[in-house]
Design a protein with these regions (language model features):
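Short amphipathic alpha-helical coupling segments at ligand-binding clamshell hinges
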Residues: 193, 262-274, 282-285
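Extracytoplasmic ligand-binding site segments that recognize negatively charged/polar headgroups
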Residues: 42, 78-79, 85-205, 209-216
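A ligand-binding cleft/hinge motif common to bilobed small-molecule-binding domains
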Residues: 88-92, 216, 221-239
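Early extracytoplasmic/lumenal segment of secretory-pathway proteins
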Residues: 26-91, 364
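Periplasmic-binding protein-like
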Residues: 163-166, 273-295
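An extracytoplasmic/periplasmic, membrane-proximal ligand-sensing/linker region
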Residues: 295-348, 397-398, 402-416
């Protein structure tokens, strides 16, 4: 063979060999996208690796909306599975045709369906969590605080500066808790509770599992969390206590397989492992700490049930509203509550003045944006894979414009309440 022909063919052969090796490597790899932290998944990954030696398992952690954005990128082809408690994420992927259909035995059991996604033929429910309050018993004793029984207790002034929680924008489970409070108490009463708890926050945790960590470390007293994070710490630290709150909904844990052009045998094998009797019977005992779909012991009708369709649709709007009302105004909200509490103590024996202060307090903790406004906006900007990039940009612009309007209304209301309190105190000082 002439040398020049060999010199031409050799790079092509090497390139083809490289592509073949890369493809074979991808076939020996399992990539899991999850909204959970990495550590609780390690026992499951280790068991899978023991059964399928030589298969590399990668875990990618993203929040729900970031996961949707990641999977919408056309060049992302290597993700095999999605593991999450976010109904928003799973419904979005199912509706956009990104998920492979699953066999009937892998679908949600009937008794859990009232708390689960309405669309389940592409999603397997592998377990579920309850939610409640976690607290540090030593901290409560030191600060002479009562043991809380339910989330609404955290709205009481006695917990001012002792509470932490995550935000719905950063945590899908927190979003479910917020929606649970709104469903149980109604929009206005629910927001009053949320705003009062918000004013009691020492800080908003950037991560949902950070709530239990903060409390275990003794930085704060109490906060809402799913049971798995609290129960794991409670096994190691006897001063960490947890109580279920039936104000919250039950939260299924979902797994789904991303639809690929090839038959991904290891993705199917991992789902089968999660559904196996060996894993299901030990799920609560390991660091994953979920209730098995074989275990109905926690389930009762008192847990709040959510209208899944509407809460999935309005997730982004509600997350923005929570951040505008609480997260971004946390210092002002706390200062206002402190001023109100001090004024109430000062005029505790002046009923006429106290009544005016309490009216100002009601204004502070009233949500000026109606549920109808939020739902109407959610319908307008509802995610749709058929939308062009221009239409998606228009939806984002509409959300930003509405968010600015909401922010102005919230700020005006808080400023008005502060001004009224200052005027009242000045008048009474004369």
């Amino acid at each position: 063979m002439p040398r020049w022909i060999f010199a031409f063919i050799l790079p092509c052969l090497l390139l083809s060999l490289g592509v073949l090796i890369q493809a074979q490597a991808a076939e020996r790899e399992l990539v899991i996208l999850t909204t959970f932290s990495r550590e609780p998944l390690l026992p499951l990954v280790e068991e899978f690796s023991r059964r399928y030696q030589g298969i590399e398992v990668q875990i990618i952690h993203r929040r729900a909306q970031s996961s949707v954005q990641l999977l919408n990128k056309s060049y992302i082809q290597n993700i095999d599975l999605v593991l999450s408690s976010s109904p928003y994420l799973m419904q979005n992927l199912a509706q956009s045709g990104k998920l492979a259909a699953l066999p009937e035995p892998m679908q949600t059991p009937e008794w859990l369906k009232p708390y689960a996604l309405p669309m389940t033929e592409h999603v397997a429910t592998i377990g579920y969590s309850g939610a409640g309050l976690v607290w540090n018993q030593d901290y409560l004793k030191t600060h002479q605080l009562p043991e809380p029984k339910q989330f609404s207790d955290l709205a009481k002034p006695v917990y001012f500066g002792h509470v932490t929680m995550s935000t719905p924008a950063r945590s899908g489970t927190t979003q479910m808790m917020v929606e649970s409070i709104l469903a149980k108490y109604g929009w206005q009463k629910g927001w009053e509770i949320l705003l009062r708890v918000g004013a009691n926050l020492a800080t908003a945790s950037a991560r949902s599992f950070g709530v239990s960590d903060y409390i275990a470390n003794g930085q704060f007293a109490v906060g809402p969390t799913i049971d798995s994070y609290a129960l794991i710490l409670g096994r190691k630290l006897d001063y960490v206590q947890f109580v279920y709150d039936e104000s919250f909904t039950l939260m299924p844990t979902y797994v789904a397989q991303i639809r690929q052009n090839h038959n991904d045998q290891y993705a199917k094998a991992f789902i089968e492992l999660l559904m196996s009797n060996a894993v299901q019977t030990n799920m609560e005992g390991n660091d994953f700490a979920k209730h098995s779909v074989q275990d109905q012991s926690l389930v009762n009708e008192r847990f709040t049930r959510l209208p899944m369709g509407s809460i999935i649709r309005r997730e982004e709007c509600l997350n923005d509203l929570f951040d505008l009302a609480i997260t971004k105004h946390l210092p002002q909200l706390k200062d206002t509550l402190l001023a109100v509490l001090e004024a109430k103590e000062q005029f505790a024996r002046r009923p006429s003045v106290l009544a005016k202060i309490e009216q100002i307090e009601r204004t502070v903790f009233t949500m000026p944006i109606s549920e109808q406004e939020v739902d109407a906006l959610a319908i307008q900007i509802a995610p749709n894979s058929a939308l062009s990039e221009e239409q998606q940009a228009e939806s984002a612009m509409l959300l930003a414009e509405k968010g600015h309007e909401w922010q102005m209304r919230l700020e005006k209301q808080l400023e008005q309440a502060n001004q009224e309190l200052k005027i009242l105190l000045a008048e009474e000082a004369q």
